[in-house]
Amino acid sequence: MAQRYDEMVHYPGLDGMPLAGFGDAHTGRALQHHSLSQSAPYGSTGAAHRVPMPPGMGSNDGLKREKDEIYGHPLFPLLALVFEKCELATCSPRDNSGSFPGGDVCSSDSFNEDIAVFAKQVRTEKPLFSSNPELDSLMIQAIQVLRFHLLELEKVHDLCDNFCHRYITCLKGKMPIDLVIDDRDGSSKSDLEDFTGSCTSLSDQNNSWIRDHDETGSTHSGTPGPSSGGLASQSGDNSSEQGDCMDNSVASPSTGDDDDLDRDKKRNKKRGIFPKVATNIMRAWLFQHLSHPYPSEEQKKQLAQDTGLTILQVNNWFINARRRIVQPMIDQSNRTGQGGAPYSPDGQNMGGYVMDGQQHMGIRPPGFQGIPGDYTAAPSTMPMGFPPAGYTPAIPPHSAGLRHGPSLHSYLPGHPHHASMILPAGASPHHLVSAQSPADALLNGQNIDIHAH
């Protein structure tokens, strides 16, 4: 119909009419009442404005005559004007700073002015209605429907503007905090998914390493107790070696094929998960430093440079890793420990996984770490600790004795077997220094080989 509007002749009164807005809903009724009160005869003035139909369109004379009557109706220019306003309001950007007196050309605020100007110009030249009352009613209803449509479009625009304003305000107030929280949640979920498959295999390797140490007569004692500097250094060496082994095992995924890995990578990219290379670097560092999985500030900076992440992301990753990698390994080893003895980082040998001196990992500080109960050592001027490096524990040759060893209560003062536990091999009780109590002999007698074969 827009093409037909362009092909039509210019209607008198439509040229030069300001395209303002629209007014209230009662204007149409007022216009109709005003027009009915006119005494001017209904004539055929509208026939002068009829547009000739293109050839081939009106084979039926009746249809052609009806179209000509609609196009030549005095209210048809107003109908075309309202229709154009609806099109502009639908597909054109709104401009509140328009040059028209009533504001935006697509607005409904100046509808009264539009109607008044049109009625004034038309009344001076011809009547507002034709000789066909049915056609007059059709034109008025069509104008009202388009005007209601224009009002609804304006409501939609107002709702859109209100929603956009509130949405932008909400984003400005919450976006910084929400981004940090979402980043942490995403990294936590990614760490959990990445490490679920590796925890079980690492725990199995840990158990096999424990059995290997038991069979080969490792220098690590299965008896819970304090550790010396020499044993701590050996434990650190074993930790690094086993960490390398674990790093190699983690570097080669054991489950899934290449297609699954590609799909996982695509899914991780969509979720904003850390790159696989970055997680592998941090995992390798974690497994190589299981005895103390707490990187220093310099190490965090270096890891951040190596992985391309921020220091905060590296720090959060290690917090999650200590909770979701190290602790499940300890729990899994407790459930699958050999000989029915519960696995504990306080006493049982875990092949380099002991977190030395870490209070928040549930491990007691150096001293009598493996002593159960509420035993409190007697005051002494010398620090408590393991025997010096170089001593070999007196452990039964049987593998069960290697794992469990004698009860630590035997080393406590007052126990029936206390004297025999602190004597050297082949020595009798009278060889002890009489000036020292059994507790002093245990704590201060460093020159007594209590583990001699």
UniProtKB/Swiss-Prot annotation:
Membrane-crossing segments per the record: none
Subcellular location: Nucleus
One cellular component (GO) term of this entry: nucleus
Chain positions covered by the region annotation Disordered: 33-64, 192-272
Entry annotated with the keyword Transcription regulation: yes
Residue ranges with Polar residues bias: 197-209, 231-242
PROSITE patterns given in the database record: HOMEOBOX_2
Span of domain MEIS N-terminal: 102-185
Portion annotated as DNA-binding: 267-329
InterPro entries: HD, Homeodomain-like_sf, KN_HD, PKNOX/Meis_N, TALE_homeobox
Superkingdom field: Eukaryota
Key words of the record: Activator, Developmental protein, Differentiation, DNA-binding, Homeobox, Neurogenesis, Nucleus, Transcription, Transcription regulation
Compositionally biased region (Low complexity): 218-230
GO molecular function, one term: DNA binding
Example GO biological process: positive regulation of MAPK cascade
Record has Cell membrane as a keyword: no
Family: Belongs to the TALE/MEIS homeobox family.
Described function: A caudalizing protein which is required to pattern the anterior/posterior (A/P) axis during central nervous system (CNS) formation. Inhibits anterior neural expression and acts as a transcriptional activator to induce posterior neural gene expression. Maintains a proper A/P balance required for hindbrain formation by activating the FGF/MAPK pathway, which modulates the planar cell polarity (PCP) pathway. Interacts with retinoid signaling during hindbrain patterning.
PANTHER family attached to this UniProt entry: HOMEOBOX PROTEIN TRANSCRIPTION FACTORS
Protein name: Homeobox protein meis3
Source organism per UniProt: Xenopus tropicalis (Western clawed frog)
The gene coding this protein: meis3
